[in-house]
Amino acid sequence: MKQAASLGVVVLAGLMLSGGLALAQDDASVPEPSGTDAAVEVKAASYVEQTTIGDMFEVESSELALRKSGNPQVRAFAQHMIADHATSSHELKQALSAAKVDAPVPTALDGEHQELLNTLQASTGADFDRNYLKMQMDGHQKALQTQVDYRLHGGNKELQDFATKATTMVQTHLSELGKISQGALLSQ
């Protein structure tokens, strides 16, 4: 008898709880579920924007390094960044086309990256090299997170495949940065 009474209390509590939840969720407060394609496109659009702006910054800041740096290690790294990130941008556009996702591709830096570029333009000598290498390290760490996040959680296979390849590239750049940062800064 005690078990039946206990079961009755549990069932009653469950009904009250579910009834309370049902009352709390009227039709006006429950958002309509968005389509899977829309959710994927939003995520893909954000990924494409972050990756494209990152590539543009790497190329533009590295072109500046070729003009302003006198350090051969910094200049060699900058040349490598221009080549790799130009290739990355091209491959991203190909993946985006294959993915058939309508995601706008930025054509200019955002405000944050333009400010960083302005800081570099105002720098000279050893300060330029330090700023450039620090910005490269910071930018590549952010890029790595972006690539890994999309590779693991993105909703489009073509873009995930690109993110996998880009992850390897960014990891290589971070490794190179670790090596040349020490040498470049110690030799000044």
Residue ranges and their predicted role:
Residues 2-11, 18-188:
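His/Met- and acidic-residue-enriched segments that coordinate or traffic transition-metal cofactors
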